[in-house]
Amino acid sequence: MKNAYHICLSAGSEVCCRDEEDYLYYFNSLALAIAHTESSLMADSVMSNHIHECIRTARLVELIKRQRYTYTRYFNAKYLRRGSLFMRHPFVIVLDG
């Protein structure tokens, strides 16, 4: 059963998207993760160091892992960095009612 979630991915003090190409890659990686997990995006907002998303999915963990891995791999290669971009545990709230 698909549930709706508010997801917040925080990068702490790191800037998630430094230029327009980063934003485009982020949105494309999000679209691919949504398509792969048969989810639907209801709303999103990309801030300088964190991202908010409202998503309806039955495969929440897979969606978040796929999205974080794809974008972090791109970001690390582009900016010659290593390690996680986002904090280990995303903020997730089930939206019901």
Regions found by a protein language model. Name each.
Residues 1-97:
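Short catalytic/metal-binding and nucleic-acid-binding patches
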